[in-house]
A protein has these predicted regions:
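Mature catalytic domains of secreted/periplasmic carbohydrate-active enzymes
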Residues: 126-127, 208-211, 221-222, 226-230, ...
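Carbohydrate-recognition beta-sandwich/jelly-roll modules
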Residues: 1-211
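The substrate-binding groove and active-site-proximal loops of carbohydrate-active enzymes
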Residues: 175-193, 219-235, 281-300
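Acidic/aromatic-lined carbohydrate-recognition and catalytic surfaces
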Residues: 220-268
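A general structural detector for well-ordered alpha-helical segments in enzyme core domains, enriched
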Residues: 196, 200, 236-240, 302
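Active-site-adjacent "subsite" loops/lids of carbohydrate-active enzymes
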Residues: 182, 250-302
Length: 302
């Protein structure tokens, strides 16, 4: 079965310009493969690690998604064109192997698997361009790999997810409720979200752990891009939150704290530009840089 907990057979680096002073190092310790990258002048964008082996038995693969699944995660045959974010599972009937990266990685990590081996991509870009390490050594990620037998693939997946996340941040109680994006898609109003709260409260009657009613995009004056001020269809959001509590649900709201269109001109030094720098579908062409102290203070106080 698949095992990438060893030194890779090939390492490639992609930088903005020259990569002559860029170095990738790997270290195996405590059943983990540590991947480091350092550079003085070069601005690395991607690290590519490749492990060569032959898959000789029938194998099904399932990978994760970057943020969440929309019902599209599945077991499929080996396909080297599919990128699998964070981790993947390989099942050969009586055995399941999990390969992935520990949570809290210093990059966005994805995997590709084919019959001849496995490739891991470490996206270390900052704001869409190569990261300026200025001599620093960055821990891009920590790879782990486990093999399970005698249990179902689902049980193996749960066990492997515990391996990848040693210190999970779990809520004291289950989080559940409603989110109006999945039927309104940004076209809603104060009256409609109040009705959402009433329906959610009715469906959860008798539960001591009360549900959330989340108001998604469509409540602000400039959807998607900020500033995060209520539009005329919603009015005072604090009043709506208070009404939710009276109804018997916990108020929730959707927001992009690192997007505020007004700040693009007021504080351009706070912003990171996107590669395409386009304003399609009202999406902002920038985002606030959370490494800037003033940005963090603004988000806390806004």
């Amino acid at each position: 079965m698949i095992n990438i907990l060893r030194e890779p057979d090939d390492i490639k680096i992609e930088c903005e310009e020259d990569n002559k002073d860029c170095t990738v190092e790997t270290e195996i310790k405590d059943e983990k493969l540590y991947v480091y990258i350092s550079a003085a002048v070069a601005r690395p964008r991607f690290i590519c690690l490749r492990w060569n082996y032959r898959v000789t038995e029938p194998t099904r693969i399932m990978g994760d998604k970057w943020e969440r699944s929309y019902g599209d995660m599945e077991w499929h045959s080996l396909n080297g064109e599919i990128f699998m974010p964070w981790y993947f599972l390989a099942n050969s009937g009586d055995k399941t192997v999990g390969c992935g990266v520990m949570t809290g990685a210093g990059s966005f990590v994805s995997f590709q698997c084919d019959a001849s081996g496995c490739t891991a991509w470490f996206d270390v870009r900052c704001g869409g361009t190569g990261v300026r390490l200025n001599g620093r050594r960055l821990l891009a990620g920590v790879i782990v790999c486990r093999e399970y037998s005698g249990i179902s693939a689902f049980a193996a997946a749960k066990a492997f997810c515990r391996v990848m996340c040693e210190n999970p941040r779990l809520p004291e109680k289950p989080v559940y409720g409603s989110n109006n994006w999945y039927y309104a898609y940004g076209k809603s109003s104060r009256a409609e979200v109040i009705r959402d709260a009433e329906i959610t409260a009715e469906l959860s009657a008798g539960n001591k752990n009360r549900p959330f009613t989340v108001i998604d995009d469509g409540w602000s004056v400039n959807p998607c891009a900020g500033p995060w001020k209520p539009n005329e269809k919603f009015g005072d959001m604090a009043e709506i939150a208070a009404e939710f509590k009276k109804i018997g649900v916990k108020p929730g709201i959707w927001i992009r704290p690192l997007c505020d269109k007004e700040l693009e001109k007021l504080h351009p030094e706070w912003c990171l530009s996107r590669i395409n720098d386009g304003d399609t579908n009202n999406e902002p062409s920038y985002c606030l840089d959370p490494t800037v102290p003033e940005v963090r203070e603004y988000v806390r106080s806004a």
